[in-house]
Amino acid sequence: MALAWCVVRRSASKFASVYGGRVRSISAVANRASLARNPSSIRPFVSRALNYSTAIDRISSEQTLIRVIDSEINSALQSDNIDSDEEMTPGSFPFRIEDKPGNQNVTLTRDYNGEHIKVVVSMPSLVSDENDDDDDDDEGPSNESSIPLVVTVTKKSGLTLEFSCMAFPDEIAIDALSVKHPGDSLEDQLANEGPDFEDLDENLKKTFYKFLEIRGVKASTTNFLHEYMTRKVNREYFLWLKNVKEFMEQ
C-alpha cells in the first residue's frame, strides 16, 4: 500500500512539473501575442528612449557649432581688420563718416560752397574679367574689387544732381546721372533719368568727373574707401558670429 502511494505521489509531482512548464510556456507565448496585438503597452518606453537620444544629438550638435563659432571669433580677433577705422582715416579726408554696426552701407557727408554732398557707399564686390583668357596679355590681376557709390549734390533750393558710380582702385566710373527736383514723385524721378552717360560727349563726361573731384569724390577717396569697406566686411562678419553664438547659447 505504501509503495502504491509513493508511485502515485511521484506521478503527480512529475505531472505537475511538466504541466507547470507547459503553462509557463503557454503564458509567455500568450504575453508575446498580447504585446503584438497591443504594442501601445511598450510604446511609452520606446518613445522616451527616442526622445532622449534626439535630445542628446541636438545638444551635441549645438555644442559642436558653438565650438566652431568660437574658433572663427578667435581668428577674427587675431586679425587687425576689425579694429576701429578712426586711426586709419587720413586727416585730409573731407567727409564725415556715418557707419552703424549691422548696416550694410556707409554714408559720407560734407558741405561745400552752399551745397550738401552725400555719398552712400555699399559693400565691395569682386569683379572678374571673364574675357581675359590669354595669359600672355595679362598685365595685372584679372580680379579687382569694386564699390557701388551713389553721390548726391544738393543745392539750397533742393535741386539735386545724383550720380550712380562704381569705384575701382585708382579709378571712378560714372554709370548714370540724373536731376532730382524737390517734391518729385517716383514717376517723375524715373522720367528724369536722362541719357545714357556713355553716350555723352567726351568733353562733357570729363567735366562731370572734374565736378566730382572738386567736391572730394576722387581716386584718393575711393582708395581709402576700399580699405575701409574691407574692414567693415570683417567687422560685420564678427558681429554676425557673436549674434549667432548668443542665440545658440540661450
Swiss-Prot record:
<dbReference type="GO" id="GO:0005759">
    <property type="term" value="C:mitochondrial matrix"/>
</dbReference>
<dbReference type="GO" id="GO:0005739">
    <property type="term" value="C:mitochondrion"/>
</dbReference>
<feature type="transit peptide" description="Mitochondrion">
    <location>
        <begin position="1"/>
        <end position="52"/>
    </location>
</feature>
<protein>
    <recommendedName>
        <fullName>Uncharacterized protein At2g39795, mitochondrial</fullName>
    </recommendedName>
</protein>
<dbReference type="InterPro" id="IPR003428">
    <property type="entry name" value="MAM33"/>
</dbReference>
<keyword id="KW-0496">Mitochondrion</keyword>
<feature type="region of interest" description="Disordered">
    <location>
        <begin position="124"/>
        <end position="147"/>
    </location>
</feature>
<dbReference type="Pfam" id="PF02330">
    <property type="entry name" value="MAM33"/>
</dbReference>
<feature type="compositionally biased region" description="Acidic residues">
    <location>
        <begin position="129"/>
        <end position="141"/>
    </location>
</feature>
<comment type="similarity">
    <text>Belongs to the MAM33 family.</text>
</comment>
<dbReference type="InterPro" id="IPR036561">
    <property type="entry name" value="MAM33_sf"/>
</dbReference>
<dbReference type="GO" id="GO:0005794">
    <property type="term" value="C:Golgi apparatus"/>
</dbReference>
<keyword id="KW-0809">Transit peptide</keyword>
